[in-house]
Amino acid sequence: MNIIEQKFYDSKAFFNTQQTKDISFRKEQLKKLSKAIKSYESDILEALYTDLGKNKVEAYATEIGITLKSIKIARKELKNWTKTKNVDTPLYLFPTKSYIKKEPYGTVLIIAPFNYPFQLVFEPLIGAIAAGNTAIIKPSELTPNVARVIKRLINETFYANYIEVIEGGIEETQTLIHLPFDYVFFTGSENVGKIVYQAASENLVPVTLEMGGKSPVIVDETANIKVASERICFGKFTNAGQTCVAPDYILVHESVKDDLITALSKTLREFYGQNIQQSPDYGRIVNLKHYHRLTSLLNSAQMNIVFGGHSDEDERYIEPTLLDHVTSDSAIMQEEIFGPILPILTYQSLDEAIAFIHQRPKPLSLYLFSEDENATQRVINELSFGGGAINDTLMHLANPKLPFGGVGASGMGRYHGKYSFDTFTHEKSYIFKSTRLESGVHLPPYKGKFKYIKAFFKN
């Protein structure tokens, strides 16, 4: 038995002590986690800057602050979330009472990506703790400084074998995903998600897969172009475009395309200055592998660049880039970009834009900028996507009352707020029947009982 397997079975043993099922225990662990995150704030911010070049304002808002808010909500609502439900019972089951009891799955695996390497460990972990599970965390090896901080924080905060961190790369992940966990929560690419799903199926382990895809932005002829440009630039170029719900491409009505490109270019200068590489507010690509993938896409689209296009390998810097005259068969349109390159395509009618999106895998997010209520309702009703926004980008993630998750190729399952608790919770149903009364209608022999059975099911 290797070290990873030993940690897995030790975690299972801790769960079997029944300690995590106590509500006061769960609330105390969440309280300890909140305190630890606050204590480690400067270390977390420094690690995020080292690994991804994140400005501390952006890093706090998208990694630390949102996590602390989720802990606060979970602690406040946990008593209500965990209540056993007494549900209605049909008359033909009299004298019976029916219940749904919330119970933890057991020992869960959380695999996190590099783009929000702190938040995307702790958001699902909050749900796992609140639901009463033990957990093993696999942070991304592409953000090693953040991973080391997470491991120190976890080891200093929680009991051994309760919450564990496994560092490493592909080999460690392969070992983990083939173990018989009670639940697997994965955030990452579609290709790796398929591998995780297949491995989990060998042990019939339920999964949540949070993946990505090409999330479109539709800008119609009624849109407020200035507002659209600001909110699109924020959504696309935050974290240097390395956001699973970032706008991947724009579908703009041909009549306002030139105005939009002008506005986007102006907004980028307002956000990051004339020399964007020197801006303290603009991030970096996570590593050279992803840098070279993105510069290859840039090189294939040199004739289409209308803003940006510069890069610096030593700094893993890629300038925010706008591409015009892009077609559906362009190289940039064949894969999720996951970087600061924004293709702009045009359409003539909303029917055409909707058909374009219909022909592609269901996106994780979709955004529409429009003042036309009819257009808004058509997009919401006719297109399938994980989540999205009208006249904004990204910000639907900031509401913990909304479920977050994909559909189709962009993922399965959902979390955030109570939905995180629900994800890591098994709803166990049972009935309690009195021994004092028994109709006997459902028991053999059945002679003469047919009319009574029919009568029961009419009620």
Q: Could you tell me what each predicted segment is?
A:
Residues F15, Q19, S34-I37, E41, ...:
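Structural signal for hydrophobic packing residues in well-ordered secondary-structure cores
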Residues M1-Y99:
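N-terminal Rossmann-like NAD(P)+-binding subdomain of aldehyde/semialdehyde dehydrogenases
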Residues K21-F25, I218, Y317-N459:
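Conserved C-terminal structural/oligomerization subdomain of aldehyde/semialdehyde dehydrogenase
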Residues L91-V227:
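Rossmann-like NAD(P) dinucleotide-binding subdomain of oxidoreductase/dehydrogenase enzymes
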Residues F158, N191-T327, I390, G448, ...:
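ALDH superfamily catalytic-core signature
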Residues H178, M211-G212, T243-V245, Q278-S279, ...:
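Short glycine-enriched loop/turn motifs at secondary-structure junctions
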Residues R26, I71, G132, I163, ...:
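Residue-level signal for inorganic ion chemistry
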